[in-house]
A protein has these predicted regions:
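Metal-dependent nuclease catalytic regions and adjoining charged, substrate-binding loops involved
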Residues: 3-15, 20, 24-25, 211-297
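Active-site-proximal structural scaffolding
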Residues: 9-10, 49-52, 60-61, 80-84, ...
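Short, contiguous acidic/charged loop-to-helix segments that flank catalytic cores in large enzymes
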Residues: 74-79, 120-128, 158-164, 189-202, ...
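Non-catalytic protein-protein interaction segments used by genome-maintenance enzymes to assemble
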Residues: 150-219, 227, 261
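Active-site-adjacent bridging/hinge elements
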Residues: 57-68, 104-108, 174-187, 236
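A non-catalytic, helix-rich entry segment at domain boundaries
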Residues: 86-161, 245, 249, 255, ...
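C-terminal, charged and often intrinsically disordered regions of DNA end-processing helicases
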Residues: 1-97, 148-150, 280, 289
Length: 297
């Protein structure tokens, strides 16, 4: 609560308090703080109404975790994010024409520098990451046999309603011979969901909604009359499967996208506050703020 505290100090304090509260240490839980038992303000925050696909997914799962979850993340989460960032950098570099071997060498060197593990574990991590990059490269090569690469890391800024604007970056955008666009989203996790989950995948649906209200000028997707679509695909080169993992989503109808779009304005309201919803979902057991969540016993 010290206004002079920095962002790092506040996050560390929140992380430690969450751990103390989980251990039932008296006074650690915010409910036991007399100064924190009432609402500090009733005035909503001013927001732009911009939502990224990942933000939409997080807010639909649990608004409370979407807003506060990052203050209690552990160091392993940071390493996972850095691993994903480097893999995406490689995917982008080869898409822009950089020599794949040179790009891999640079990314592997960066990945090794962020490791703080024993030598035996380092070798395993390097081999695993190298395989992920090789499989991502192979998927990219195969995907361009019958389709044209329209762009990589494409900025998206499309207003889909008066209240909501979708913003973010598409990893890749492919175009078939008839001019239909396919959204490609690279996932760097070690496991992939069941194929049936693709049809309802929120991030792909959000990208499709943006394309349905957008136009592509060769560099970015902006407000427009709508683009012809093939749907979307999640690519999992790091999954422990023989074949490179793919989860597909078909081209959604205007009715399906309209129904999905109706879910978004309430998410903007959640971000504005001053009150926010806590919602049970399948990830509650591993939520970093479970110990202070009002819907958990």
């Amino acid at each position: 609560t010290n206004p002079e505290s920095g962002e790092v100090e506040r996050k560390q304090a929140a992380r430690q308090l969450a751990r103390l509260a989980a251990a039932d240490i008296p006074g650690a839980h915010p409910e036991q703080w007399w100064s924190a038992r009432s609402v500090a303000a009733e005035t909503p925050l001013h927001t732009s109404g911009s939502l990224s696909p990942s933000r939409v997914e997080a807010l639909l799962n649990c608004p409370l975790k979407a807003v506060l979850g990052n203050v209690a993340e552990d160091p392993s989460t940071e390493e996972h994010l850095l691993r994903g960032t480097l893999a995406h950098a490689f995917f982008e570099a080869i898409g822009r024409g950089m020599d794949a071997e040179k790009a891999k060498l640079l990314v592997m060197e960066a990945f090794e520098r962020i490791q703080d593990v024993p030598q035996w574990q380092l070798r395993f991590k390097l081999d695993e990451f190298s395989t992920l990059l090789d499989r991502a490269r192979e998927w990219a090569r195969q995907s361009e046999v019958n389709q044209e690469l329209a762009g990589v890391e494409i900025p998206v800024g499309v207003r889909v309603s008066e209240e909501v604007r979708i913003g973010g970056y598409m990893d890749r955008l492919l175009r078939d011979g008839e001019g239909n666009y396919l959204v490609v989203d690279l996932k760097t996790g070690r496991s992939k969901p069941a194929k049936k989950e693709g049809e309802d995948h929120v991030q792909l649906m959000t990208y499709q909604l943006a394309l349905a209200h957008g136009a592509f000028d060769g560099h970015q997707v902006h407000d427009g009359e709508g683009m012809p679509r093939q749907g979307g695909v999640l690519v999992y080169p790091g999954a422990t499967t023989k074949k490179i993992g793919e989860i597909w989503q078909s081209d959604k109808s205007p009715e399906a996208l309209e129904e999905f779009a109706a879910l978004l304005p309430p998410l903007v309201e959640e971000m504005r506050g001053p009150r926010i919803t806590a919602r049970t979902n399948k990830d509650c057991d591993k939520c970093p703020i479970r110990s202070i969540c009002p819907v958990q016993e």
